[in-house]
Amino acid sequence: GSFALSSGARAVSAVRAALRLPTPTTTTSVPAAAELGIDGLAPVITPSADFYRIDTALVVPQVDPADWTLRVHGLVEQEVVLRWDDLLELAPKETVATLVCVSNEVGGSLIGTARWLGVPLREVLARARPTADADMVLSRSIDGFTASSPLEALTDDRDALLAIGMNGEPLPIEHGFPVRMVVPGLYGYVSATKWVTELEVTRYDRAEGYWTSRGWSERGPVKLQSRIDVPRAGARVEAGTAVIAGVAWQTHVGVS
């Protein structure tokens, strides 16, 4: 019962602490001018401990990398199974990406930007060679969660990743250690599968994900949104000159 769960959590935490991430073949830098130095304004890179979470299960899965596998199957010419060591042999890259929850309210905190280290999903899918009639990938988590992602979003130039690192460290356990999906430009409900173990290449007219089966739209592109951080909500603003600062985002598309 609870003793087994706590023992498993301690074991996986120890494995994570001892893990050394591979060096990325490419990195993305954040311009120094992006940090404006305004007190109260959210930093460009969200600390991992402050990054938002949306969970659909009561228990956080504890997955040892030695036991992890990823199966790619469905409408493909060649089924592929990858283990942790296989994933590490592929060329990892680091990218800066913003994730946001579709249920983030105006002024809400369900958004974060991190440095993600991982293997491009397009390279993994290329090994399986999806058939011409496929248009969706149904990803599955070890806890049963599913997300339906447009195939083109996983294979274009947006650097959708099978992520293994976050902000220079192995993924936090609660954020999907050892492997999760990160897809810039899509809301999490159709892309951000944590503890991912399966990619089923399929079609929208044949399958649906956890949230789309509950009435949410199929493709979930991130829409333009903004937030005022300074002054904070409810703060008293004195007469005279005041600083107003915030953030805006539309990942993959960009804001100009």
Label each region the model flagged.
Residues G1-A11:
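N-terminal export signals
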Residues R10-S256:
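Structured, non-membrane catalytic/scaffold regions adjacent to prosthetic-group chemistry
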